[in-house]
Amino acid sequence: MLDEVLAELDPKPGEVVCDCTLGGAGHSIALAQRIAPDGLSIGIDQDDMALKAATERFSREAPRAEFLPLKGNFGDLDQLLVGARVPGVDCFLFDLGVSSPQLDIPERGFSYNEDAPLDMRMDSGKDTPTAQEVINTYNEADLTRILRVYGDEKYAARIARAIVETRGKAPIETTFQLVDVIKRAIPAAARRHGGHPARKTFQALRIEVNHELD
């Protein structure tokens, strides 16, 4: 994947590159090494931990490159670049998904393989609805919509109905509680194929919570 990115973007010394989904900074480091020493590598992420880790990684692995970390959502790309007084960018990189460090911290609630509170906020310090709030407050139609649109979930309506029925008895508060609801909603035959049955639902919730496609 990295080789394909480098071949497609073909960064050159002195250029300005912007990684709009910084995450673990692996792609940014590789790009920065190509544009050093006079280029500028910009990294955007909502997660304070990701920005801090990337800054430290740049100092170790790309010390000759100039790195500008910007906290925010790539949906606000124009405002972020104007606010940082960046005159122009030669190439942009978007890698939609969750970085490994985020998955490695169970309490962030991104992983369906670890039991944790349903949070999923990339910026955990931001006062925005968590996945738990989405699951327990959205009506059935809205839940169906986000599962279908953001997760391409074939059984979106069945899962949404099961969520509403379950939360009517008690709130759904943890990742494993939600996984259990999803497994019960999906036909047994479907659970045996296509990866983890909760994968698409968790993806859809993450996108909704963080407004990734706004």
Name each model-derived stretch:
Residues 1-214:
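S-adenosyl-L-methionine-dependent methyltransferase catalytic core, i.e., the SAM/SAH-binding region
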